């Protein structure tokens, strides 16, 4: 198994519902180390830039509106096979299809307000981490 980093967002609905601590506890119980974290309120420009690959798709404007509706938590998780394992604990994008006990099954309010985002590949994790964190904001721990 390979030690990897992945990028994670706790979305506005989960922040508003005061679920940050519960979600962080799940990350840590799953063996992840949180090596960078911060709270921010995305501007429209930041959200459009982050989700640029989805521009022109029918859900894009609603996604940007939702992601700018309140504060979010962004974090870098480190662990063995972090990208896939994080996707496994998040559950299906549509919370109606998410397995019981996954983050989306437990903390989502709707398809758009599905509580969390996670990188889908090592390459996207690197890009997404760099979008929100400078190298000196990441603190690996042994």
Curated annotation (Swiss-Prot):
GO cellular component terms given for this protein: cytoplasm
Cofactor(s) it depends on: Mg(2+)
Main localization of the protein described in the UniProt heading: cytoplasm
Catalytic residue positions: 117
Alphabetized CDD domains for the sequence: NDPk_I (cd04413)
Enzyme Commission identifier(s): 2.7.4.6
Cited InterPro entries: NDK-like_dom (IPR034907), NDK-like_dom_sf (IPR036850), Nucleoside_diP_kinase (IPR001564), Nucleoside_diP_kinase_AS (IPR023005)
Catalytic activity, reaction form: a 2'-deoxyribonucleoside 5'-diphosphate + ATP = a 2'-deoxyribonucleoside 5'-triphosphate + ADP; a ribonucleoside 5'-diphosphate + ATP = a ribonucleoside 5'-triphosphate + ADP
A GO BP entry: purine nucleotide metabolic process
GO molecular function: ATP binding; metal ion binding; nucleoside diphosphate kinase activity
Segment forming the signal sequence: none
UniProt key word Transport: no
Residue sites binding ATP per the record: 11, 59, 87, 93, 104, 114
Function: Major role in the synthesis of nucleoside triphosphates other than ATP. The ATP gamma phosphate is transferred to the NDP beta phosphate via a ping-pong mechanism, using a phosphorylated active-site intermediate.
PANTHER family the record matches: NUCLEOSIDE DIPHOSPHATE KINASE, NUCLEOSIDE DIPHOSPHATE KINASE DDB_G0292928-RELATED
Family, per entry: Belongs to the NDK family.
Protein name: Nucleoside diphosphate kinase
């Amino acid at each position: 198994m390979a030690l990897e980093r992945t990028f994670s967002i706790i979305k506005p609905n989960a922040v508003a519902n005061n679920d940050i601590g519960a979600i962080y506890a799940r990350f840590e119980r799953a063996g992840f180390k949180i090596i960078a974290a911060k709270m921010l309120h995305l501007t429209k420009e930041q959200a459009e830039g982050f989700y640029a690959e989805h521009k022109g798709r029918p859900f894009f404007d609603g996604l940007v509106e939702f992601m700018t509706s309140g504060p979010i938590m962004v974090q870098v998780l480190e662990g063995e096979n972090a990208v896939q394992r994080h996707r496994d604990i998040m559950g299906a994008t549509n919370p109606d299809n998410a397995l019981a006990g996954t983050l989306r099954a437990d903390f989502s309010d709707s398809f758009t307000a599905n509580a969390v985002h996670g990188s889908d590949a090592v390459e996207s994790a690197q890009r997404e981490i760099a979008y929100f964190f400078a190298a000196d904001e990441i603190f690996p721990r042994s």
